[in-house]
Amino acid sequence: MRWVLAGLTALLLWLQGLLWFGEGGLNDVRGLSRSVEAQREEVDRLRQRNQALEAEVNDLKTGLEALEERARSELGMIREGETFYQIIEREDDAR
């Protein structure tokens, strides 16, 4: 009976050792959990970056007309072949 109990105790200790320190044991699981969490944070950061880049691309695609209008009105830019006429009012007419 003692030998059986000693054998079962040894088996239990061996299995506990495998559970804690063996391949696929709790130490590996903890390390993998940390790695997974780091990867999730990286994915979240990259998703936010992708969203910002996508918004910038959409602005550039759809915002060209607005950009052109702003360049025309604020900077006085014209297209090639166009003629720019600026009407200057006299100070007497402005009053």
Curated annotation (Swiss-Prot):
Essential cell division protein. May link together the upstream cell division proteins, which are predominantly cytoplasmic, with the downstream cell division proteins, which are predominantly periplasmic. Belongs to the FtsB family. It comes from Alkalilimnicola ehrlichii (strain ATCC BAA-1101 / DSM 17681 / MLHE-1). It is a single-pass type II membrane protein. Part of a complex composed of FtsB, FtsL and FtsQ. Residues 1-3 are cytoplasmic. The keyword Coiled coil applies. Its main location: membrane. The gene is ftsB. This is Cell division protein FtsB. It comes from the Bacteria. GO terms for cellular component: cell division site; cell septum; plasma membrane. One of its GO terms (biological process) is FtsZ-dependent cytokinesis. Keywords: Cell cycle, Cell division, Cell inner membrane, Cell membrane, Coiled coil, Membrane, Transmembrane, Transmembrane helix. Residues 22-95 are periplasmic. Pfam families: DivIC. The keyword Zinc does not apply. The chain crosses the membrane at residues 4-21. Residues 26-76 form a coiled coil. InterPro entries: Cell_div_FtsB, FtsL/DivIC. The lineage of its organism: Bacteria, Pseudomonadati, Pseudomonadota, Gammaproteobacteria, Chromatiales. It is found in: Cell inner membrane.
